[in-house]
């Protein structure tokens, strides 16, 4: 199994330095990862650094809380696309989901998908905060909104677990017939965990431990 082609090598910590970023990008080249996932302020640099490769530059929108307005998320997406982002990972508004404001969720996903201009849109559900029924409902809303992937986690929930096999399986079973894919992220720190997520249905893995997993 070519694990490197599942991995989006990730650096999203708020105190990430240019040195940290360059290390991530060099490792992405060394291991030929499918992509890197960086904060919006680092998209332009990452795109330039990787310009002679086929490594995707992925960024995050409304991260990590998902509580920005729809309008600001759309503007953030437009700016990230302009700066060279190949794919967008947006954070769902968990509060709106729990309040049953499903039209809001679908509308937000749809508007951000339009702003992606044909690029893949992944919707981060933040599964640590949701019940199984809420995870399934969120996946159904992602289908309605036109998303390309559903994603487990930001990795920023206090005392959160991140990606769990049972959640990845539930997400996969909910979206597979609609053609959506699953990205598992959060807590994937070794080869064993990576393989378990893939076997559960994940096509992408978001992890800061890509080099360790593939060594």
PLM regions with names:
Residues 1-82, 137, 141-144:
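Conserved N-terminal beta1-alpha1 strand-loop-helix module at the mouth
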Residues 6, 35, 54-58, 87-89, ...:
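Structural preference for beta-strand elements that scaffold enzyme active sites
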Residues 16, 38-42, 125, 188-189, ...:
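Short beta->alpha linker loops
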Residues 20, 24, 42, 73, ...:
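General structural feature for long, well-ordered alpha-helical segments within catalytic domains
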Residues 32, 37, 92-99, 127, ...:
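Glycine/Thr-rich beta-alpha phosphate-binding loop at enzyme active sites
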Residues 40, 44-65, 100-122, 126-129, ...:
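Alpha-helix-loop-beta-strand connector modules within alpha/beta enzyme cores
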Residues 47, 68-79, 130-141, 166-173, ...:
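Catalytic cores of alpha/beta
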Residues 59-70, 82-97, 144-161, 186-215:
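Glycine-rich phosphate-binding active-site loops on the catalytic face of alpha/beta enzymes
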């Amino acid at each position: 199994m070519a694990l490197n082609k599942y991995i989006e090598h990730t650096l999203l910590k708020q105190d990430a330095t240019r040195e940290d970023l360059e290390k991530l990008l060099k490792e992405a080249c060394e291991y030929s990862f499918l992509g890197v996932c960086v904060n919006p302020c680092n998209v332009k640099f990452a795109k330039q650094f990787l310009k002679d490769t086929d490594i995707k530059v992925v960024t995050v929108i409304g991260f990590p809380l998902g509580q920005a307005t729809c309008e600001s998320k759309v503007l953030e997406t437009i700016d990230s696309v302009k700066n060279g982002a190949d794919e967008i990972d947006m954070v769902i508004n968990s509060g709106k989901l729990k309040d049953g404001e499903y039209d809001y969720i679908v509308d937000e996903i749809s508007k951000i998908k339009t702003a992606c201009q044909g690029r893949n849109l992944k919707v981060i559900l933040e599964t640590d905060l949701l019940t199984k029924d809420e995870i399934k409902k969120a996946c159904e809303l992602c289908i309605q909104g036109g998303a390309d992937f559903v994603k487990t986690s930001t990795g920023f929930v206090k005392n959160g677990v991140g990606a769990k096999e049972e959640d990845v399986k539930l997400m996969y079973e909910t979206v597979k017939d609609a053609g959506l894919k699953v990205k598992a992220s959060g807590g994937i720190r070794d080869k064993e965990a990576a393989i378990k997520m893939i076997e559960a249905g994940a096509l992408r893995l978001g992890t800061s431990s890509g080099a360790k997993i593939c060594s």
